[in-house]
Amino acid sequence: MKKVILLAAALFVVVASFAQNEYNYQKRSLFEQLPIRGNDIVFLGNSITDGCEWAELFNNRHIKNRGISGDRSGWLLDRLDPIVGGHPKKLFLMIGVNDLAAGVSPEEVAANIGKLLDRFAEESPWTKIYVQSILPVNGVDTKAKAKNHWKKGAEIIEANKLIEALCEGRKNVLYIDVYSALVDQKGMLDQRYTNDGLHLMGEGYLAWKEVIEKYVK
């Protein structure tokens, strides 16, 4: 019986991974057909970015959502061409939590973000880049689906410190601490804002909006 359970679990992981990759490819293919222009504001990241209707939230038709569920900092580097080539006015980046959940170090996450910043500095230097902190996670709910994520609270804090330091002194780059606006007194993602310990509910996106609204305008 134990072997059957282990086999079923392994098959589930394989199927989930395949489905995730298929979704990633589908979204990338779509984004490659949708041009970015010089007056656009791009939101770039993983499922937490992907899950919001940013243009509607800010009532701004120039906002383009380029979040892809499951994305990681290294994978994100492979899909920058249409974004950098479009020379957007602004870029809001949030990435890294999936890396940490997969065992990637905070140092490597920061290094990949550094590569992104270097590329924009070289190819689209007038784009204003807002690097947002990785959000907190919450594992209080034992039914939380993102168990590999909510064990990474300490790594998230460390990664945010490295990312903030990375942004210092760079032209047209600003680090934004969104983490502090969504964390509770116990150092976890406020339960008002999530239903699975990782992703955001509507109130969570509104709290995020309050932090960055002055930069989006």
Please place each PLM-identified region on the residue numbering.
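Bacterial Sec-dependent N-terminal signal peptides
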Residues: 1-20
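Surface-exposed cleft-lining segments at the edges of enzyme active sites
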Residues: 65, 97-109, 145-152
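Generic structural signal for well-ordered alpha-helices
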Residues: 80, 113-118, 160
